[in-house]
């Protein structure tokens, strides 16, 4: 028996096929890779429930452009658009004028934006320049860990731009 690519058959089917293998077939690097795929699938599936519409947004803290820690829950009482983006992301930069327009339209109506950058440490200056050049006047944070950004992982971000709109109680009311 052999295992079929999970993209073609789905992770559940991969798991079923793996579970039906004989014990001696479950040793070695290929078996470890298959286990890793199955475990990653369930981890992402579980993480997704935390960021579904209606869920309370997972709290996180990251440093702002001045190195000061900012916690998402400190914005409770306002509508918050969490905007995951990066200076190197063309679609993000193209979307920034729309985010600026929304911010300017609603900033006096109990609304703000929290930008979360997926830039790298070596791209910090480019991130700061993009904030200035794109007129992003709201709070910006990042741990400068690229796709390993802790908040992005918590929110199961696989592509950017990505957005989550929170109500004043911190509940997710819309995405993207």
Where are these regions (language model features)?
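Short beta-strand in the C-terminal region of the ABC ATPase nucleotide-binding domain
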Residues: 173-176
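Oxidative protein folding and maturation machinery
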Residues: 1-70
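Structural microenvironment flanking redox-active thiols in thiol-disulfide oxidoreductases
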Residues: 94-134, 144-153
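A short beta-strand-turn-helix
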Residues: 60-80, 105-106
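Short, internal strand/loop/helix patches
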Residues: 58-63, 128-169
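Short active-site neighborhood of thiol/selenol oxidoreductases, capturing the structured segment around
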Residues: 70-93, 99
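Active-site acidic short loop of glycosyltransferases
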Residues: 76-78, 108, 136, 157
């Amino acid at each position: 028996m052999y295992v079929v690519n999970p993209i073609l058959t789905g992770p559940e089917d991969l798991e079923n096929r793996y579970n039906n293998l004989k014990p001696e077939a479950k040793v070695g690097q290929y078996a470890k890779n298959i286990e890793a795929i199955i475990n990653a699938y369930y981890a992402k599936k579980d993480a997704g429930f935390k960021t579904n519409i209606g869920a309370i947004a997972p709290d996180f803290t990251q440093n702002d452009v001045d190195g000061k820690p900012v916690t998402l829950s400190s914005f409770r009482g306002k509508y918050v658009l969490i905007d995951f983006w990066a200076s190197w992301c063309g679609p993000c930069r193209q979307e920034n004028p729309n985010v600026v327009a929304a911010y300017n339209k609603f900033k006096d109506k109990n609304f703000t934006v929290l930008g979360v950058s997926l830039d790298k440490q070596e791209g910090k200056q480019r991130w700061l320049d993009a904030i200035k050049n794109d007129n992003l006047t709201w709070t910006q944070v990042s741990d400068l860990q690229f796709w390993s950004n802790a908040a992005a992982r918590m929110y199961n971000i696989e592509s950017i731009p990505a957005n989550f709109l929170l109500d004043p109680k911190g509940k997710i009311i819309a995405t993207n």
